[in-house]
Design a protein with these regions (language model features):
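Short, hydrophobic beta-strand segments
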Residues: 114-126
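Beta-sheet-dominated interaction scaffolds and their linkers
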Residues: 23-69
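Short solvent-exposed strand-capping/beta-turn motif centered on an Asx-Ser/Thr pair
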Residues: 63-69, 79, 125-127, 142
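Bacterial N-terminal signal peptides that target proteins for export
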Residues: 1-8
Length: 158
């Protein structure tokens, strides 16, 4: 009877260790904005009064924290009047938005330990018109994803 209790107790302890995994699963990548890690579901507000460029530059970094290289998809979901703004996203080159509400971009083979700068530009079609809106970014490598919202406020140029 003592032997059965010993094996039962040992099995419970073993299952507990296996289910807990001995710690958290390491995050394969982090997204940084202004030097800080962007938490999942974060909201970032961007205000601009740049009268020379009349656009809203916004950039973030994706850093590979894993031991392997992998590709990352960036989904841009726009929530604003698509006739008032033009956007482009720059990874290794700048690619204009396709006029759709949602677009997916790919960073191919991000090496282990490296980071990739992502530039996003939003330009008003008519710089004198004030406008507000938001863009939801989702970054995913297929197994792990994080998302954040960028809210922008363009006051217009007089």
């Amino acid at each position: 009877m003592k032997l059965v209790k010993f094996f039962s107790l040992s099995l419970i302890v073993l299952l507990t260790l296996v289910s807990c995994g001995g710690g958290e699963t390491p995050v394969p990548f982090n997204v940084y904005f202004d030097g800080d890690i962007i938490e999942d579901k974060a909201t970032i507000t961007v205000n601009t009064v740049d009268e020379i460029l009349s656009e809203m530059p916004f950039y973030f970094f994706i850093e590979n924290e894993s031991d392997n290289s992998f590709s990352v998809n960036i989904t841009e979901k726009r929530n604003y009047d698509l006739t008032k703004f033009e956007s482009n996203l720059c990874i290794s080159q700048c690619l204009p938005g396709n006029g759709e509400e949602t677009q997916v971009w790919t960073v191919d083979n991000l090496p282990s330990g490296f980071s990739q700068k992502i530039d996003y530009h939003l330009s008003p079609v008519d710089p004198s018109t004030p406008a507000k809106g938001e863009v939801l970014f989702t970054v995913s490598n297929g197994d792990y994803s994080t998302s954040f919202t960028v809210i922008f406020d363009f006051p217009g140029i007089n």
